Amino acid sequence: MVAADRLSEINIADPAVYERGVPHVDFRLLRDHDPVHWHPWPDRSSGFWAITRHADIVAISRDTETYSSAAEHVLIVDLDPDELEARRSLIETDPPQHTRLRRLVSSAFTPRKVAEYEQATRNIAAGLLDEIAAAGGGDFVSAVSAPLPINVIVSILGIPAEDAPFMVELSNHLVAGTSGVRLDAAAYGNTTPLSHLPFDSPASHALFEYGRRIGRERRTDPRDDLVTRLVHAEVDGESLSDVEYCNFFQLLVFAGNETTRTAISQGMLALLENPAELDRLEDDPALVSKAVEEILRWASPIMYFRRTAMRDTELGCGTCPETSTSASSPNQIGST
């Protein structure tokens, strides 16, 4: 039996921990011995429930009435109601609002359109891999994992290729420490309080303004791209509001660049650190689809998602009181 003091020493909330690598040993201890673990939040009087078992995380994800994504931000940050509304995107909603937003954007993700996005992605990836192979090798991050997702997302959105570096600049600024530059609150002409902007960053203001501009262009000059579908989407006479559109555009650019870039890079590192798994892939390419899912779990760029308990509830072998926060991450759970 693992001593209680060993469990109490676990700290999965400190960013410095992840600079040394994902704490898989601690995640395993929690899964095996305390899968619904009360974790104090450093420098705060409160804390959160760290949920680490697959079945519990699936249950939380499916039960939106008990575990809300909308009650608070999906990150553990303290926001006033007006701040939360200003920053709310698809991932901070529950049904029926979540259902409405999905219906509005579904025309951009039909099977035919997804097949087109897949082919565009394959073409871009093949070109980048051909280039690094012709060069005799190189830095995988700068040659493949960094340019691939941003080139894909600008192609899908309909953003001019020459604006791709600006999209990278802005999305890098959204992640503390990624760009290495702390922005002044008034950067990019921002006058919005930072608490009303995603990531507390004026780069979000710049993404909003860019999204608004290209959205206005597509309303009068529609094209076969994702922005056109977003600005013209309508269900039962309703369309996306300005706030909904801006936050959705920001989410697509950020998720289509930073998180994907990190997952690809971390996934390649994981394969290099586990050469036997790389050999399995080379020997049996049919395993690639399963490998992608495992990379997204093991090398996830997202450390956690927050849910808020809407009532006292039993979860696994623990109890989550009403209004308490639970946090779970793909790389905390065991594979199934």
Each model region followed by its residue ranges:
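Cytochrome P450
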Residues: 1-336
